[in-house]
């Protein structure tokens, strides 16, 4: 009888161990699947702008940019005039580094053409109405090789005539049309592209072609 009881206890222990092992494997598999779902989340796709989506908004080619309007960077206060002392600029106006996935995708993408623009004689900048802290955090996380400019409260955006008028309430008030402006060292606008659809922005190839057309 005692021998039978020992065998029964051993059998129960083995069954419990197998069950616990199965639970552990199931939990591990669930964690692995969850990780794969998070890691495989697709990035927002930004489509290239077409001729029909380009709009005539903001300052025109040949106009003077608002040189004295204040901007903020992670290093402190500056102006467009001071920035242009470093050479001609290509400025990408974007809605928000914080909540606009199309903007985030574009800002990461143009990192690839920093050197191409420098070879053509232009410094690249991104501009949004976000605070310098938010821009700096995004820039460091994405290892951006160009400077972000903070335009609070959208004075430069307004100076360029780029405020998107459809937003009159909520966090999007003050955002610009998704735009690219090329400015010479004297502050004259020498090329531009303004999109009427924030989901569509100039591709890197289109940006370089815009510069090459000058």
Spans of model-derived segments:
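Bacterial N-terminal signal peptides that target proteins for export
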Residues: 2-10
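Bacterial signal peptide processing site
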Residues: 23-26
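N-terminal "domain-start" segment that seeds a small globular fold
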Residues: 45-82
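Short active-site neighborhood of thiol/selenol oxidoreductases, capturing the structured segment around
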Residues: 80-104
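Structural microenvironment flanking redox-active thiols in thiol-disulfide oxidoreductases
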Residues: 101-156
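Structural micro-motif
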Residues: 145-146, 164-167, 173-181
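Thiol-/selenol-based redox modules, centered on thioredoxin-like
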Residues: 173-214
């Amino acid at each position: 009888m005692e021998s039978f009881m020992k065998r029964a206890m051993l059998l129960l222990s083995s069954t419990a161990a197998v069950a616990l092992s199965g639970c552990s494997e199931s939990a591990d598999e669930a964690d692995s699947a969850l990780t794969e779902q998070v890691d495989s989340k697709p990035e927002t796709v930004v489509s290239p702008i077409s001729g029909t989506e380009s709009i005539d908004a903001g300052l025109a080619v040949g106009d003077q940019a608002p040189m004295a309007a204040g901007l903020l960077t992670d290093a402190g206060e500056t102006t467009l005039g001071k920035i242009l002392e470093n050479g001609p600029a290509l400025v990408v106006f974007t809605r928000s580094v914080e909540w606009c996935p199309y903007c985030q995708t574009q800002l990461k993408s143009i990192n690839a053409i920093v050197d191409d623009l420098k070879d053509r004689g232009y410094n690249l900048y991104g501009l949004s109405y976000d605070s310098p802290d938010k821009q700096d955090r995004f820039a460091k996380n994405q290892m951006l090789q160009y400077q972000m400019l903070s335009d609070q409260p959208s004075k430069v955006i307004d100076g360029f005539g780029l405020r998107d008028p459809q937003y009159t309430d909520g966090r999007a008030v003050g955002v610009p049309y998704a735009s690219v402006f090329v400015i010479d060292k004297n502050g004259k606008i020498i090329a531009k592209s303004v999109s009427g659809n924030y989901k569509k922005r100039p591709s890197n190839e289109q940006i370089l072609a815009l510069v090459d057309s000058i």
